[in-house]
Amino acid sequence: MANIDKDKLKAIEMAMGQIEKQFGKGSVMKLGEQGAPQMDAVSTGCLDLDIALGIGGVPKGRIIEIYGPESSGKTTVALHVVAEAQKLGGAAAYIDAEHALDPVYAKRLGVNIDDLVVSQPDTGEQALEITEALVRSGAIDVLVVDSVAALVPRAEIEGEMGDSHVGLQARLMSQALRKLTGTINKSNCVVIFINQLREKVGIMFGNPETTPGGRALKFYASVRMDIRRIDSIKQGDGITGNRTRVKIVKNKVAPPFKQAEFDIMYNEGISKEGNIVDVGVKENIVQKSGAWFSYGDIRLGQGRENAKQYLKENPAVALDIENQIREKYSLPLAKAVESTSVEENTEESVES
């Protein structure tokens, strides 16, 4: 403020004082007084995606949109974010508007389903009111709305099957997001909206794909992720998973348009070990010679699947490689997962 006139400074201070009297302390401030604010993030459970997002995960206090075709992995990515938040002692909520949440699959991904707050609302208005109440509580760290396309306005549910309801859902989303944005920021909660894809009719040039729910979500979302299945992972004759690509089409907290590729294995979720191998090779931390993968003097295996299996059986080596990658990108270091509860359970089953 050195270049500002003293009279102007005095006038600003007086105006700020009046605003604080009227609206309360903290309603107006100088940005520099707070120091450089650190952008907190919740990991996605996928190393390459954390790197692509630029801050090590999805930003807290912001709205996130994940969209893509059917069976592309949208819910899987959202559930991994929930699991990562719970691992750090956070609370999570899931608004299941599609009435399709599989608790068995969620548990396999690492979600603590006993503590997960779940709601299966009847209407879009009800879903968004529940969302607002949970966010306003200040106790929820991650909230997932699955999905925007399933948020059906009350008028549509109460009306006849063939009735026209033009723009109802878009108006509902616009009104809800206007109310939610400030509350989400104050409560430091990550709100993830899962969305589907639709096609515009009669588009000759350009991309005909669009997302339902109007334009409001596109504006209010700080991060938008476009998720696509690009290949099938085969083992023998069977298909065991999908190769998935995520493009960060909008990012208000880091440079956008970065991409991440990873494996989503059936009944397992995102393959952490596969991701460590891929990023390790890309960053020359894991060496690839022909079909062999090695890390320093340690031979990880012949072929990618064998290297993945070695890292699964040797979590200390996997953690070491992961933390070297994280250091390179200035991301928070990963900690060793405590396996005591698993060991206790196996001991109990052996004794019984």
From Swiss-Prot:
Gene Ontology CC terms, in alphabetical order: cytosol
NCBIfam families in the cross-refs: tigrfam_recA
Membrane-spanning ranges: none
UniProt protein name: Protein RecA
Family stated for the protein in its record: Belongs to the RecA family.
Cross-referenced HAMAP family: RecA (MF_00268)
Primary localization: cytoplasm
Cited InterPro entries: AAA+_ATPase, DNA_recomb/repair_RecA, DNA_recomb/repair_RecA_CS, P-loop_NTPase, RecA-like_C, RecA-like_N, RecA_ATP-bd, RecA_C_sf
Organism name: Clostridium perfringens (strain 13 / Type A)
SUPFAM superfamilies linked to this entry: P-loop containing nucleoside triphosphate hydrolases, RecA protein, C-terminal domain
Domain of life: Bacteria
Reported function: Can catalyze the hydrolysis of ATP in the presence of single-stranded DNA, the ATP-dependent uptake of single-stranded DNA by duplex DNA, and the ATP-dependent hybridization of homologous single-stranded DNAs. It interacts with LexA causing its activation and leading to its autocatalytic cleavage.
Keywords: ATP-binding, Cytoplasm, DNA damage, DNA recombination, DNA repair, DNA-binding, Nucleotide-binding, SOS response
